Amino acid sequence: MQIFIGKIPNHVSEEQIKEYFGQFGEVTDVSLKGTYGFLNFDSEGSITRVLNQRTHSIDGAPISVERANGRKRPLDGEYHDRYMDMGRGGYSPHRDYRGFRNAPYPPMRYESRSPGRYDPRFSDRYGGRSPEYRGDSFRMGDPQRSRDFCEYCNACPIHGMRDMMDSRKRHHMSRDHPNNHLKVVFENIAPNTAIEDFKNFVQDHGFEPSYARLGYSGNHAVFEFKNIEDKDNAMKKLDGAEFNGHILKTRSYLSKDEYKSRERESHMRSELQPTDNGEAEPQGTTTDIYEGIEDAKAEND
């Protein structure tokens, strides 16, 4: 059970690091690699307590902490990178092959060109064939070359034929989580708040969330409830409540498309404000129509 620590200042010693992280649990091993290093804990709970705290600083210097991914290079990776490199397209005139003098055998130069878009033997990525293969000329509205081919839309007298450059085909609604309408965002929470402490606070008020996590900026949390009634009651009861000396604010979770739509509307309203003479005057500042809406940029599942 290992975590990664980065941005370690030069004046911070190994003893200081072990003493600081010892408050979260027993540190079994410390391995420093200069400005970064790795810590081993005796239990998974210790790592969870470290990661729940949003900020860490040692001797006044902030450091970054995250879970170690644990990936390792294969033993034969160095050989392939230095000598063969066959997995990256074979021979290239732009690659330096002077290191091959120590290899068992030099690389073989060969042509590895992939089939082109109009190669008559292969179909393109959208299911069509090359013009030479089909025997017709290339057209932007060719149904076989359309990204979202539809028998109805290509024959519809109202819609007509849509080619691959049609904006209605290139832009789709974002796929958000189906339970976003059951989520509540609690803003203005105290820094370094553990998610378990805040979850216990919500449960003490009679609500049982099905999902909870801290926001990426560290000053808000996202809770998901089982139904709309619990969500509405939690927003009404906990809005203005005090937690660790901070007054909480609640709002509904904004999906990506809803956030973009409200931000666009807010920007248009702030840019064109009518003056006394009836003319539109650009404003220097932009005010969001929803307080705390900037935090929704990072709140996407």
From Swiss-Prot:
Record's keyword annotation contains Flavoprotein: no
GO molecular-function term, one example from the UniProt record: mRNA binding
Annotated RRM domain residues: 1-70, 182-255
Sorted UniProt keywords: mRNA processing, mRNA splicing, Nucleus, Repeat, RNA-binding
InterPro entries on file: Nucleotide-bd_a/b_plait_sf (IPR012677), RBD_domain_sf (IPR035979), RRM_dom (IPR000504), RRT5_SRSF_SR (IPR050374)
Superkingdom field: Eukaryota
PROSITE patterns assigned: RRM
Chain intervals for the UniProt region annotation (Disordered): 106-140, 255-301
One Gene Ontology biological process: RNA splicing
UniProt-annotated location(s): Nucleus
GO CC, any one term: cytoplasm
Primary location group: nucleus
Pfam families per UniProt: RRM_1
Disulfide bonds: none
Family statement drawn from the similarity comment of this UniProt entry: Belongs to the splicing factor SR family.
Function: Plays a role in splicing.
Name this polypeptide is given: Probable splicing factor ECU05_1440
Organism: Encephalitozoon cuniculi (strain GB-M1)
